[in-house]
A protein has these predicted regions:
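Glycine-rich phosphate/pyrophosphate-binding loop and the adjoining helix
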Residues: 130-156
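Short, conserved loop/helix-junction motifs that constitute active-site signature segments
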Residues: 67-68, 93-102, 127
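Short, glycine-/small-residue-rich phosphate/pyrophosphate-handling segment
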Residues: 104-140
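Residue-level signal for short, function-critical loop segments
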Residues: 9-11, 79, 107-110
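Charged helix-capping and loop-helix junction motifs
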Residues: 87-93, 118-121, 147-152
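Structural beta-sheet core signal
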Residues: 5, 75, 104-107
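Short aromatic-enriched loop/helix-cap "lid" or pocket-rim segments at secondary-structure transitions
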Residues: 40-44, 117-118, 146-147
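N-terminal beta1-alpha1-beta2 submodule of the flavodoxin-like/Rossmannoid cofactor-binding fold
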Residues: 1-73, 82-85, 128-130, 153-156
Length: 156
């Protein structure tokens, strides 16, 4: 069974989470992006604006990946402005017809008591079918590598 871990990252936290999951389950890893530099404070503000207004016009996977050659795809993305990032949602919408039957979501966020599961499950509408599983990983003041490992172990 081939698995691909796809991720978008602004600060490398989601990248670390997804690389950890990939290492544990023996998956390939690839990054997706809209091609914009979203580093620093202004990058964050722009990212939040794009998420609230859903203004991501393009998204692509950096490496040439044939999604249909995978049995499972795990899509990692951060939370921006209290919801899964617009780039992640754009990826699901654009590539939904190419996704394998098993798709999982990994959403990283700074914290609080909100686990964002209602908003994560809403992404199934973009996918056009229910996802196979989801996890919400808090990264602030939390061992997110350990938490991602616990999720990965459920996939083995």
């Amino acid at each position: 069974m081939r698995t691909l871990c796809l991720y978008y990252t602004r600060t490398n936290t989601t990248k670390a989470v997804m690389e950890n999951i990939a290492k544990i389950i023996g998956a390939d890893v690839a990054e997706y992006t809209d091609g914009k530099n979203r580093s620093g404070f202004l990058g964050y503000v722009g990212a939040c604006f794009a998420t609230v207004n859903n203004t991501i016009l393009k998204v692509y996977i950096r490496d040439k990946i044939d999604l249909k050659s995978y049995d499972h795809v795990i899509i990692g993305m951060p939370v921006w402005a209290e919801g899964p990032c617009a780039i992640g949602r754009a990826l699901i919408k654009k590539y939904s017809s190419s996704m394998p039957s098993e798709v999982y979501y990994v959403v990283t966020h700074m914290g609080g008591k909100n686990d964002y599961m209602d908003k994560i499950k809403a992404m199934d509408m973009l996918l056009g079918r229910p996802s196979s599983g989801q996890v919400s990983i808090r990264t602030k003041e939390n061992d997110y590598i350990k938490e991602s490992a616990l999720f990965a172990e459920t996939l083995i």
